[in-house]
Amino acid sequence: MYLDSAKKAELFEKYGKSVKDTGSPESQIALFTFRIAHLTEHLRQNKKDFATERSLKMLVGKRRRMLDYLIKVDIERYRAIIKELGIRR
């Protein structure tokens, strides 16, 4: 599987405050970005997989809402996370 508990723990440790920090916006955005990259690669190979395309659009929307929240709360954390993950705005 592309996303196991070890990979999640690695993402949470790198972008969150600790391995158990699953709720911070940075760790959630990092997880969404990882899943978006995986689904994008899947859709390049399977162009007619419309269910996955819908899932991808929903994930992008969730990440966008989380980024909008982070802008309102702390603009510096927002700038740091988009620079680190390479997200366009």
UniProtKB/Swiss-Prot annotation:
Organism domain of life: Bacteria
UniProt xrefs under InterPro entries: Ribosomal_uS15 (IPR000589), Ribosomal_uS15_bac-type (IPR005290), uS15_NS1_RNA-bd_sf (IPR009068)
SUPFAM superfamilies on file: S15/NS1 RNA-binding domain
Alphabetic keyword roster: Ribonucleoprotein, Ribosomal protein, RNA-binding, rRNA-binding
Cysteine disulfide links: none
Listed NCBIfam families: S15_bact
Family: Belongs to the universal ribosomal protein uS15 family.
Protein name: Small ribosomal subunit protein uS15
